[in-house]
Regions:
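Peripheral docking tails and interdomain loops at the edges
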Residues: 267-278, 387-389, 408-409, 417, ...
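Glycine-rich ThDP/TPP pyrophosphate-binding loop and its adjacent helix/strand module
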Residues: 73, 108-266, 271-279, 283-288, ...
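Cofactor-binding active-site loop characterized by glycine-rich and histidine/acidic residues
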Residues: 41-162, 300, 305, 314-315
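N-terminal amphipathic, basic-rich helices that act as targeting or association modules
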Residues: 1-81, 203-206, 214-223, 237-240
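Non-catalytic terminal/interface segments that mediate subunit docking, oligomerization
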Residues: 249-359, 364-374, 473-475, 490
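Glycine/charged-rich beta-loop-alpha catalytic/anionic-binding loops adjacent to active sites
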Residues: 29-36, 95-111, 133-139, 314-329, ...
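A glycine-rich helix N-cap at a beta->alpha junction
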Residues: 85-98, 160-179, 370-383
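A short, small-residue-rich loop immediately preceding and capping a beta-strand
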Residues: 38-40, 64-67, 110-111, 134-149, ...
Length: 553
């Protein structure tokens, strides 16, 4: 295998184009070996193999610097920079994260996992290079889907006006984000593709950037030629290449959305080799709720920043929603502000995404929603330890980040009935005062009778009256609270009080004062971080008193 002899990009340069094509095949075998066994980002990596080879063939990494947007398409880059064991040796899979990581290699310059950041980061590298009087090439690599993010567009604007030196932006255009692209700029990209880059309506040139187009984005020889044209250029330039997402695996080529990311699967059939059970799930429950809600309530509208699958909205469900569905592209700030406007006008918006991405819209939540008290409902998935995949995709900071924003009601359901009741209450026509953030449970589905009305804010619910110890178990951790209560009764001989707080954004002070009569310890359980988290509210409340508080995360 030629790849056995490639331990750095320098080793790549001695091979012919035909041999490099063999290397591309070998890289895809490495991708298959890893992804069939542990899963990961499939389509982005299979579609960018040839471009990665050409980039490393033409440029001189790490002296020349690559910044991969999201970096979920960097697996081939890792194989060519001394990390191929993480793809061919099953025992070493854990050595390579799913994203670029400077701790792994001198060829990686940033920990990246969120989208639309590469152009700004690379622009900073270019400016720093110029200040220090250096001469290397700086290359940002970004997918067409990521261009919908405001940070990417802002950085392109800055590059076109503020930089007069080497700066290369490779736009990997596979005509797809995770789902289909949304936004007017994609009409411009299509016009450029259809005209082989010659359309006069060119947004990149409008920003003051040079531009070159390459239709054959999966042809190594063509890519080498175009990258050689821009190497050592003395002006910012966009290299727009047209690639095929999922190239090399027919199932992925036909279903770009479904194969953006994969679980372990059988290569011959494409079927998952892991079982998720046949029972109900909160994801399935959510998508069903949204579709039925839209059918019954024409004032209801779903807003998502390119993450419809975060709540199980596949192509079929999105088609059913019709005009009651808005995909803003990767634009969390715009999504939240748009939802605030929808709510102010009298309709009922539901913003859906993953918790790790909502933090990008913190200012809009605080300013455009909460200060204005617009009744926007935000529904977040992966807001717990469930589903954590990398340091860049942690949802566990959400409670600390959002529960302290004035006027925001944060609800943490502990059962299916409670979850649906909270959605119903938040989206009810009578509920016009409160912005609401609801965390989708990450546990297996559990069932328990639930209240229908949450107008009495911050009212906790005592599920089991007891003594001495009060267990306050939030959301996903309520099941753990039940287990702790049972263990205390069995081992200590008394029944503790078990409380389902439901609200994470405030305290039930009346209930907490009542606990002081016959309890000596309050134990809080939460799915988040300690500092600034839910439990610290109780430590602060009981600070002047004798009550002991134990916070467990």
């Amino acid at each position: 295998m030629i790849l056995d002899n490639i331990n750095s990009p320098k080793d790549l340069k001695k091979y012919s184009v035909s041999e490099l094509e063999t290397v591309a095949d070998e890289i895809r075998e490495g991708l298959f070996n890893r992804l069939t066994k542990i899963g990961g980002h499939f389509g982005p990596n299979f579609g960018f193999v040839e471009a990665t080879i050409a980039l490393h063939y033409v440029f001189d990494s790490p002296n020349d610097k690559f910044v991969f947007d999201v970096s979920h398409q960097a697996y081939a880059h890792k194989m060519l920079t001394g990390r191929k064991a993480g793809y061919f040796d099953d025992s070493r899979f854990s050595e390579d994260s799913g994203y670029t990581n400077p701790d792994e290699s001198e060829h990686d310059f940033f920990n990246i996992g969120h989208t639309s950041t590469s152009i700004a980061l690379a622009l900073g590298l270019a400016k720093g290079r110029d200040i220090l009087g250096k001469k290397e090439n700086i290359v940002a690599i970004i997918g067409d889907g990521s261009l919908s993010g405001g940070e990417a567009l802002e950085a392109l604007s800055v590059a076109g006006s503020e930089l007069n030196s080497n700066f290369i932006v490779v736009v990997n255009d596979n005509e797809q984000a995770i789902a289909e692209n949304h936004g007017g700029l994609y009409k411009n990209l299509k016009a450029l593709r259809d005209s082989n880059g010659k359309s006069e309506n060119n947004m990149f040139r409008a920003w003051g950037l040079d531009y070159i187009y390459e239709e054959n984005g999966n042809d190594i020889a063509s890519l080498i030629a175009v990258f050689e044209k821009v190497r050592d250029s003395n002006r910012p330039v966009v290299v727009h290449i047209h690639t095929q997402k999922g190239k090399g695996y027919e199932l992925a080529e036909k279903d770009k959305e479904g194969w953006h990311w994969c679980v372990p699967f059988d290569r011959a059939t494409g079927k998952p080799t892991v079982s998720f059970g046949s029972g109900e799930s909160y994801l399935g429950m959510t998508s069903q709720y949204i579709v039925e809600k839209a059918k019954k309530d024409k004032d209801f509208v779903v807003v998502t920043p390119a993450m419809p699958m975060s709540v199980g909205l596949g192509p079929e469900e999105r088609a059913k929603l019709g005009s009651q569905y808005i995909d803003t592209g990767i634009a969390e700030e715009a999504a939240v502000a748009i939802a605030s406007g929808i709510a102010r006008r009298g309709a009922k918006p539901l913003v859906v995404t993953n918790m790790t991405f909502l933090q990008r819209a913190y200012d809009q939540i605080s300013q455009d929603v909460c200060i204005n008290k617009t009744p926007v409902t935000m529904l977040m998935n992966y807001s717990s330890f469930d589903g954590l995949t990398d340091v860049t995709h942690l949802g566990i900071f959400g409670l600390a980040a959002f529960t302290n924003i004035p006027n925001l009601v944060v609800l943490c359901p502990s059962s299916a009935e409670e979850y649906i009741s909270m959605l119903d209450w938040s989206l009810d026509s009578k509920q016009k005062e409160n912005p609401v953030l609801i965390l989708i449970p990450g546990n297996d589905v559990s069932h328990r009778p639930a209240d229908k009305d949450y107008d009495d804010l911050n009212r906790f619910k005592i599920e089991q009256k007891g003594e001495k110890v009060a267990i306050i178990a939030l959301g996903d951790f309520f099941q753990k609270g039940e287990a702790v209560a049972s263990a205390i009764k069995e081992k200590c001989g008394f029944a503790p009080t078990l409380i389902n707080p439901r609200f994470a954004s405030g305290l039930d002070e009346e209930l907490l004062h009542g606990l002081e009569k016959n309890h000596q310890l309050v134990l809080t359980l939460e799915d988040g971080i300690l500092e600034g988290g839910f439990g610290q509210k109780f430590a602060s409340f009981y600070g002047p008193d004798k009550m002991l508080v134990k916070i467990t995360v």
